[in-house]
């Protein structure tokens, strides 16, 4: 698989996991497996991964009321991976990001 990592999943809960337990949460491709995720994190961030847990999240149903009636739809399904690193290791999400004022 090319690169299963889509983006870091930054929420209040995931930030708490990072601070307390050293676990990082990523949104990954639906067909990604734990081995691909482990290899991608180790290669991209240069850290040792202790374990990977995955969660398949179902997309929410959406309804929109218009003049012509009800339009029903659905958000896409997605998958998240909770990656635990070895002791003393950490990931800096923002190391490659440029400041907003530049470029």
Curated annotation (Swiss-Prot):
Record SUPFAM superfamilies: Ribosomal proteins S24e, L23 and L15e (SSF54189)
Keywords associated with the record: Ribonucleoprotein, Ribosomal protein, RNA-binding, rRNA-binding
One Pfam family, short name: Ribosomal_L23
Entry superkingdom: Bacteria
Alphabetized GO MF terms: rRNA binding; structural constituent of ribosome
Annotated GO biological process: translation
InterPro entries the UniProt entry points to: Nucleotide-bd_a/b_plait_sf (IPR012677), Ribosomal_uL23-like (IPR013025), Ribosomal_uL23/eL15/eS24_sf (IPR012678)
GO CC annotations, alphabetized: ribonucleoprotein complex; ribosome
Function: One of the early assembly proteins it binds 23S rRNA. One of the proteins that surrounds the polypeptide exit tunnel on the outside of the ribosome. Forms the main docking site for trigger factor binding to the ribosome.
Assembly and oligomerization: Part of the 50S ribosomal subunit. Contacts protein L29, and trigger factor when it is bound to the ribosome.
Annotated family: Belongs to the universal ribosomal protein uL23 family.
Protein name in UniProt: Large ribosomal subunit protein uL23
Species the sequence originates in: Chlorobium luteolum (strain DSM 273 / BCRC 81028 / 2530)
